[in-house]
Swiss-Prot record:
Mg(2+) binds at residues 14, 41. One of its GO terms (molecular function) is adenylosuccinate synthase activity. Substrate binds at residues 300-306. It is an enzyme of class 6 (ligase). It catalyses: IMP + L-aspartate + GTP = N(6)-(1,2-dicarboxyethyl)-AMP + GDP + phosphate + 2 H(+). Its cofactor is Mg(2+). The lineage of its organism: Bacteria, Pseudomonadati, Pseudomonadota, Gammaproteobacteria, Enterobacterales. One of its GO terms (cellular component) is cytoplasm. This is Adenylosuccinate synthetase. The active site is at residues 14, 42. It comes from the Bacteria. The keyword Membrane does not apply.
Length: 432
């Protein structure tokens, strides 16, 4: 039985993690975010009502679940307050269900200013960040000058630390990027206005999770972004600023690494990517347009159109390695309905003519990589909302089986629509 289950993306994010976390939390006592910030965008559809969460874990809609933001998450007080208000206006008692680690680094206005100034300065070489201050906040953490939730317990000391770090960053903003300084008093006042709310939710997350483990409670760890955006293992420098792989669970929450029981990789039936960076199977033709339109491929956080392409099993195999995946949840299979043929990338042809079945690491090494495809018959029947495997067309079943063969990982869950009821659970991770 798997008490500690990790749910993470196996591609470049936007795989459909939020819905699956929400579905599986029916049995969980805790849902934990362990990396990223409000650059994530998790969309849940329950009884036709749509909820988009950026920072708060997807378990917040369940009254039986306690949601936890772990130390690996960079926390924007402004974003958290906005999200809390939206949920509380709908009658969801967020403060009764949400806990925070005091070690969460804070994202403040100067981080956002730095993020946007840098992207503008990069010009054509812009990474395509969400402009939310995520990267600069992680930089401050590593440089040991970052302010954390725990600093808010001593308001006087917080004000002194804030002044010091803002002098440092404002010097850079004004003298290097030639933009306006961020106002110290405003940042201080805004943060102090919500300090008591934040500190009232603080808990020792590592201790809580260890006690939960000893009791045998079910815990779900919710990843944000995707494996191929990992700061260490992704398409660097076109990556996010945190560890999106399963290793981030231990460092970003305080759970001992030996206690992860099952890692569920969310796998979209085709590939998408937001922002710049390598994408060997990207389609620029009418099929790419079809996938974008049918899949409604626009970012939940930025509204940007996602780049679309065929499923890349070479890249997915890298995700299998990095995360020691136990099983897949295949999402958005219905988007492929109506295509005469579907393709799977099974290898890459390198610029020197070699065929390889593993991904390069640095983004520069992906230049000139061509996908080698395996073509399979498509299906005309609708798979949307199908709740039983026997209701799927044979061609769709063949596609599923081939993915399992190419990756060596079973598909344990199949999602056929945005609602939590439109799902086939072939093997429940908590029972695995």
């Amino acid at each position: 039985m798997g008490n500690n289950v990790v749910v993470l993306g196996t591609q470049w994010g936007d795989e459909g993690k939020g819905k699956i976390v929400d579905l599986l939390t029916e049995r969980a006592k805790y849902v934990v975010r362990y990396q990223g910030g409000h650059n994530a965008g998790h969309t849940l559809v329950i009884n036709g009502e749509k909820t988009v969460l950026h920072l708060i874990p997807s378990g917040i809609l369940r009254e039986n679940v306690t949601s936890i933001i772990g130390n690996g998450v960079v926390l924007s007080p402004a974003a958290l307050m906005k999200e809390m208000k939206e949920l509380e206006d709908r009658g969801i008692p967020v403060r009764e269900r949400l806990l925070l680690s005091e070690a969460c680094p804070l994202i403040l206005d100067y981080h956002v200013a730095l993020d946007n100034a840098r992207e503008k300065a990069r010009g054509a070489k812009a990474i395509g960040t969400t402009g939310r201050g995520i990267g600069p906040a992680y930089e401050d953490k590593v440089a040991r000058r970052g302010l954390r939730v725990g600093d808010l317990f001593d308001k006087e000391t917080f004000a002194e630390k804030l002044k010091e770090v803002m002098e440092y960053h404002n010097f850079q903003l004004v003298n290097y990027y030639k933009v306006e300084a961020v106002d110290y008093q405003k940042v201080l006042d805004d943060t102090m206005a919500v300090a008591d709310i934040l500190t009232s939710m603080v808990v020792d997350v590592s201790d809580l999770l260890d006690q939960a483990r000893q009791r045998g409670d079910f815990v779900m760890f919710e990843g944000a972004q995707g494996t191929l955006l990992d700061i260490d293992h992704g398409t660097y420098p076109y990556v996010t600023s945190s560890n999106t792989t399963a290793g981030g669970v231990a460092t970003g929450s305080g759970l001992g690494p030996r206690y992860v029981d099952y890692v569920l990789g969310i796998l979209k039936a085709y590939s998408t990517r937001v922002g710049a960076g390598p994408f060997p199977t990207e389609l620029f033709d009418e099929t790419g347009e079809f996938l974008c339109k049918q899949g409604n491929e626009y970012g939940a956080t930025t509204g940007r159109r996602r780049r679309t392409g065929w499923l890349d099993t070479v890249a997915v195999r890298r995700a299998v390695q990095l995360n020691s995946l136990s099983g897949f949840c295949l999402t958005k299979l219905d988007v492929l309905d109506g295509l005469k043929e579907v393709k799977l990338c099974v290898a890459y042809r390198m610029p020197d003519g070699r065929e390889v079945t593993t991904t390069p690491l640095a983004a520069d090494d992906w230049k000139g990589v061509e996908p080698i495809y395996e073509t399979m018959p498509g299906w005309s029947e609708s798979t949307f909302g199908v709740k039983d495997r026997s209701g799927l067309p044979q061609a769709a079943l063949n596609y599923i089986k081939r993915i399992e063969e190419l990756t060596g990982v079973p598909i344990d869950i199949i999602s056929t629509g945005p609602d939590r009821t439109e799902t086939m659970i072939l093997r429940d991770p908590f029972d695995a």
